[in-house]
A protein has these predicted regions:
Chain B
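Non-catalytic interface/targeting segments
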Residues: 1-53, 60-61, 80-82, 89-119
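Conserved residues at the C-terminal ends of beta-strands
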Residues: 69
Length: 282, 119
């Protein structure tokens, strides 16, 4: 079972839901993996005081020029769709932060003057405690293409585990990379026009990708039905409501998960998981 | 020597467009022949790294000096490799900036004056 957690809008509580969901499943017979794929700002590790067992660097290939072979034909410049190579006088200028590692330049260079060389783009850290594993991805400072690091985190997915993937906000490539191939996506939102606006974008993205989803309303207030009306209209299940409460925010701000600060949430998260299992089975 | 000014129009009476990679035109003046003409900045149509595409365009038009407002790190690196000198102004008509350049009143950029714009 692979469950992704997305939101559209940032700061709605994806990590709050992901961490408590993972902790509520500790008694399940299957091991639990929490993948922190919010690689630009990974923070799930703050809630689990675990020692990192290992870390692996993530590399992407970028072109390197051998001037003894280069004939200054400009084929590589013509091929590059990202302007990552410029031919200026007798210099081939390569811009690593613009390169998307497509490989077009070194495949099509007529003299094999361009060769792929590894560029570090991030790291993947693994922490383990009993049957629980936390895998965190970190994008290297100055790098701005996150999907390769997200994919490196997801390469650690264990098919026999319950895999929970905490993703970044938005609805573009990084989020598509975290929801891709998952059995279900939990969308965490808040009852504000901003929460709704970005929720709509995320739902539309999931529909294109054909991934089933349901909604968790965080910071819920009884008199506000802005999200309820949308979900009813779209036939989306509301899986859980987390009320707007100072106590929840206060504990969370100290790095304490919801289920640890208030254990009566544990059965609710377990029910959330069982609901997702039922939704997937349908 | 060819001097190009990033502009919003095609003549010396048009305003400077301070965005190097996204300006509409470059008004080019040839110091020796005194000729003036404009080229469209096709680099601005790039989805990303417009500054690099723009620098390549200026290089292809054998420009020696570019006058603009803002130059980012990638564009600066590309212009440096092309041996194109960068002078920065803030605002005014193309003719005013050319005048300031000739009088030595524009500062030569020794590095990018804005951060990366993303790509």
């Amino acid at each position: 079972m692979r469950i992704s957690i997305a939101s559209g809008k940032g700061g709605t509580g994806k990590t709050l839901v992901a961490t408590s969901l993972a902790l509520s499943l500790m008694d399940q017979p299957r091991p639990v993996q929490l993948l922190d794929c919010d690689v630009e700002e990974p923070n799930a590790h703050i809630f689990f005081k675990m020692k990192q067992a290992g870390s692996q660097k993530v590399f992407l290939p970028i072109p390197k020029v051998d001037y003894d072979q280069c004939q200054y034909c400009g084929k590589c410049v013509e091929v590059c769709q990202f302007n990552a190579i410029a031919l200026m006088k007798r210099t081939l200028v390569i811009f690593p932060d613009v390169c998307h590692s497509c490989g077009g330049c070194w495949y099509l260079c007529p003299t094999e003057a361009l060769q792929p060389t590894p560029r570090e783009v991030g790291a993947v850290g693994i922490s383990q405690s009993g049957s629980f594993t936390l895998v965190s991805g970190t994008l290297k400072l100055g790098t701005h293409i996150s999907p390769p690091v997200i994919k490196a985190v997801r390469a650690k997915e264990d098919p026999d585990s319950i895999v929970i993937i905490d993703g970044p906000p938005g609805s573009s490539c990084p989020v598509m990379t975290i929801v891709d191939g998952t059995d279900y996506c939990i969308l965490v939102t808040e009852p504000t026009p901003f929460g709704l606006n970005d929720l709509v974008l995320a739902v539309e993205m999931l529909q294109v990708l054909g991934i089933a989803c349901g909604v968790v309303i965080n910071r819920d207030v009884p008199e506000n039905d802005i999200i309820d009306r949308y979900c009813e209209d779209k036939g989306l299940p509301i899986l859980l409501r987390i009320p707007l409460k100072t106590e929840i925010a206060r504990a969370y701000a100290k790095g304490i998960t919801l289920v640890e600060s208030d254990p009566h949430w544990k059965p609710k998260f377990l029910e959330l998981y069982q609901r997702v299992v039922r939704e997937v089975a349908q | 020597m060819r001097v190009a000014v990033s502009a919003s129009g095609q003549t010396q009476l048009d305003e400077l467009n301070p965005r190097l990679g996204r300006c509409e035109y470059f008004v080019i003046v040839d110091d020796v022949s005194g000729e003036t003409w404009a080229i469209e900045n096709t680099g601005r149509l790039s989805t990303g790294a417009a500054g690099i595409a723009t620098a390549t365009l200026l290089h292809n038009h054998q420009v020696d000096v570019v006058i603009t407002g803002n130059v980012g790190p990638n564009a600066f690196t590309a212009l440096e490799a092309a041996e194109i000198k960068v002078y920065t102004g803030t605002k005014g008509k193309v003719q005013d900036l050319l005048e300031q350049y000739r009088n030595g009143n524009l500062s030569k950029a020794s590095g990018p004056n804005v951060g990366p714009h993303g790509s």
